Amino acid sequence: MAAGPLDRSFADGECVMLCGSNGSGKTTLMKTIAGLIPPMGGSFSVSGKTVMVPTRISKVKGFTVREFIQTSIRTGIAGASDVREAVDRAVDLLRLGHIQNCDISHVSDGEFQKACIATAFTRDCSVMLLDEPTAFLDVANRIMVLSTLKEIASATGTTVLFSTHDIHDGAIYSDSVIDLGGGSLIPPVA
């Protein structure tokens, strides 16, 4: 099911929660914003670079957590010290230091989810889209990830849009909420 019409602007540094039940159109809307699928009608525009972290990425054997995060940085764009610095920052932000040298295929689904999110933090982008970033995470890590997203948005001016099933999960960590009910847009929750 796809979301209904949406007429919305996002401010630099705004952290927006997109919520709704299964099939309400959260992932479809995220993919449309990311340019991965065309809109069914109308148009949209995104200024700057957009990074999307999908709900699920397959674990690849033979990479450490650190190497997995590093693969998100485009070769030739940054020097070795810049790459190291970006990966260090992402590892620190997502509190992955204790597993950074572990094989990515051997970490828990929750730790893998955090590593996937960390890949977004290695890139210079103006818009960050995260499709259910708190999937597979326990309560403490959900809070840590959502508060980190809010901090990143505020500190860097990056617009962050994340989706979730649970409106209570992220409402306190977002500046605004877009609630998709049954595949159609319903008014944002205050």
In which residue ranges do the predicted regions lie?
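Catalytic Walker B motif of ABC-type/P-loop ATPase nucleotide-binding domains
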Residues: 128-132
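Helix-to-loop junction immediately C-terminal to a conserved catalytic motif
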Residues: 34
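ABC-family nucleotide-binding domains
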Residues: 138
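H-loop/switch region of ABC-family ATPase nucleotide-binding domains
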Residues: 164-165
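Conserved ABC ATPase "signature" region
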Residues: 84-99, 124
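Conserved ABC ATPase signature
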Residues: 103-107
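The feature captures the beta-strand-to-loop junction immediately N-terminal to the Walker
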Residues: 19-21
